[in-house]
């Protein structure tokens, strides 16, 4: 195929878009691959669409090889199936909802579990029909509160979602593993570094889920790994709780004056100065910090919540949100404090917390707050703290919550060594859903004994546009994009420079011969554009092989450039087509 830049719908830019923060966003816009239509919404231009289709084709080939079959669902979906699974409300403000002219409710699909389930229910009724895996590559919609980083986190995006249907859990495990291995092959073919980590299931539910993360400093997700092979999204890390301590011999709780201690740091300093202990100094880890939030439940009700964590750690909003899902976390405002006069701001302790406490506010604590652990915490009086307040003896929380931040050096939950922290972008997520959706939508089949059984399901997603952005993020230099050969919009970029008609005629002939060889050719045949601009555009667009026809033609030579290495050489005109074909095909 031949694309002529003189007629190609393309406009390159020399300056970065003002809203762009990351390299992939800047370069995909500047090189004319995408164009912003609205916050989090992008138009795909011809070059971008070619790369996107190549990513889709890799995904399609590996899904087909894994035995999955492609279908295509509408993006506009009715409310009723999502009501049956509670996700109409569980998604909260995260989905786009609309009404038709008759007042019926619809949503723009964030994902399609319900619709796939109903389709299989409509067509299949026997164990003989299973196992089944079906997939689609389709546009999805999420009402992101803060779309950012171009197509990495948008409101409209392309996703491959697939679903497996099995009679039993053993079948689900096989389907899950088939998808897992297919994803490994997909990302290897795309040339993407990735790590597979344990993850939380969130609104999807299910017994098991894993994320495929692309490690990068710009990633929004924090994940951990250990020398022994443990890997998890920070939201999924479980805390190794210390053993409970016997109450016998523990000192009694005592309240002390601690004036002017608005922070953990000042509290520790005053405690060591005015209330020192004999064995060792007080540290932030000896304090119990109580943080207040409001949970907004899917039915719209608001519930105040107190979270107690050791003072040397902050509450991680993402871990808290994962722990309380599907509720959403909101700030505890001044008006909320006013409704609870028992709360003395800055000095709140467990004494007034809990559903049985004076405030009536549910109180969840970090798993490290086990029975027998002693703490410095608020005494519910201005300028006073209580020392040696013992969990299980002096206060009893309503439960535990995984909300404290995970730190480098924390022990891995499986004992495989200290954790190290890294950042990454989620490019895929796989879920062993189990029977949640099938149960809610009454998807059953007859088993071998003629008994109706609920089908067990898996759900598997690849962020196609996000994967493309990650490829761009990891394949660029100061001049522009440098596409892996398998994804480049063309195999070779032919550049005709100068004004000599013979140069353009030769470049035209070479481009035609390369197309005849089965190669995709991007041909810069623009007659009134300077060589400098053409070279800058070629480097910005990022086709891996560049063939320059210019002043060397007088000596029977053309220039062959490797975009990634920057190496170039003069080759004989008669050898140019074969040399390009060799460079492309290896």
Swiss-Prot record:
Protein keywords: Aminoacyl-tRNA synthetase, ATP-binding, Cytoplasm, Ligase, Nucleotide-binding, Protein biosynthesis
Domain of life, source organism: Bacteria
Enzyme class, first EC level, given as a word: ligase
EC number(s) per entry: 6.1.1.15
InterPro entries: aa-tRNA-synt_IIb, aa-tRNA-synth_II, aa-tRNA-synth_II/BPL/LPL, Anticodon-bd, Anticodon-bd_dom_sf, Pro-tRNA-ligase_IIa, Pro-tRNA-synth_IIa_bac-type, Pro-tRNA-Synthase_IIa_type1
Record's GO cellular component terms: cytosol
Primary localisation category: cytoplasm
Keyword Transmembrane helix: no
Annotated compartments: Cytoplasm
GO BP: prolyl-tRNA aminoacylation
Catalytic activity: tRNA(Pro) + L-proline + ATP = L-prolyl-tRNA(Pro) + AMP + diphosphate
Any GO molecular function: ATP binding
UniProt keyword annotation of Transmembrane present: no
Quaternary structure, from the entry: Homodimer.
Protein purpose: Catalyzes the attachment of proline to tRNA(Pro) in a two-step reaction: proline is first activated by ATP to form Pro-AMP and then transferred to the acceptor end of tRNA(Pro). As ProRS can inadvertently accommodate and process non-cognate amino acids such as alanine and cysteine, to avoid such errors it has two additional distinct editing activities against alanine. One activity is designated as 'pretransfer' editing and involves the tRNA(Pro)-independent hydrolysis of activated Ala-AMP.
Entry remark concerning the domains of this protein: Consists of three domains: the N-terminal catalytic domain, the editing domain and the C-terminal anticodon-binding domain.
Stated family: Belongs to the class-II aminoacyl-tRNA synthetase family. ProS type 1 subfamily.
Protein name from the UniProt record: Proline--tRNA ligase
UniProt organism field: Kineococcus radiotolerans (strain ATCC BAA-149 / DSM 14245 / SRS30216)
Native organism taxonomy: Bacteria, Bacillati, Actinomycetota, Actinomycetes, Kineosporiales
Designated gene of the protein: proS
